[in-house]
Amino acid sequence: MSKHITGHTGLLCLLGSPVAHSVSPEMHNEACDQLGLDYTYLAFDVPEDKMPEAVQGLRTMGARGWNITMPGKNIMCKLADKVSPASEISGACNTIVNDNGVLTAYTTDGVGFMRAVAENGVDIIGKKMTLLGAGGAATAILVQAALDGVAEINVFNVRDNFFGRAEEIVAKLNKRTECKVTLHDFSDPEVLRDSIAESAILVNGTSVGMAPNVDRTIITDTSMFHKDLFVFDVIYNPQETRLLREAKEAGCKTGNGMYMLLYQGAASFKLWTGEEMPVEIIKEKYFS
C-alpha cells in the first residue's frame, strides 16, 4: 500500500486509547487507494480527558471525520453539534462527520451488525432477538435492531454498572420504536431459556469467551440451542468462540464479530466519502 500525501490530502482518523492494535488505518487507507480518494487515515492515542482538545484541533484543521473507540464514545456525543437518532438514544457514537466545522455524531456499530447478519443469509426483521449484555457493543446492536424493525428484543444483563443505563435506553426504545424491548436480570436461567426458544437470533454482546479466556462461554447449558436459532458472537478473537462451536454442534447457524467490524467501517467510510467501501477487497486482505 502506498500513499502520496499532498497539501490537498484530507484527514480521517481514529481517536481512543489504546489504538495501536487497530486494523482501521489499514482498512480505510486501502479503501481510499482502491477508489483513488485523496484521504489518509491515522490513529491517535487520546485519553478521555483530552478528547475535547483533540476535537477542537481536528475541527480547526478541517479533518473530514473520525472514528472513536473506547474510552471516548460517550463524551464524543456531547462534543458533537448534531447526533443521529441511534446516537441520541444510546448516548454514544463511534463516527464523527465534519461538514465545514459542524460535527455530526453517528453510530455505525449497529449498522455493521445488521449487515453482518444479513450477509449470513439471516432475516431478523419482524423476528425476536435474545441479546446478552448491555455494554457498548450490545447497546449499539440493541438500538439499531429496534430502529430497523426487529419485533421483540429481550436483553439479559447482570445488575452491574450498565444495568441502570440499559433501563433508560430500553424505556426510550419502547417509546420511540414499535419494537418491544424488555430488560432481564441474567440470574434467571428459565426466563433466558424461554426467550431463546422463541428467538430467531441469540447475540452475545459481552466479552465472555474472548482470548485469552477461550474456555469460557456465556451459555453453559447447550440444551438452550435449537436448530432454527442463529447464534452471533461480537467477539472475533478467537474467530470461533466456545459459544459458537457448541452452538454449531447443536445444529445452529453461527456468525462472529469480524464482519461486524468490517461493515461498521464501511458505513463510516460512506458517511465521510459518499462512496461504497470495496469490501470484497478489504475482506480478502485483512479479514481472511
What are these regions (language model features)?
Residues 99, 122-128, 225-227:
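Short helix-loop-beta connector
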Residues 18, 158-162, 237:
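Residues in the short beta-alpha loop(s) of Rossmann-like NAD(P)-binding domains
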Residues 3-120:
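Phosphate/diphosphate ligand-binding glycine-rich loop within oxidoreductases
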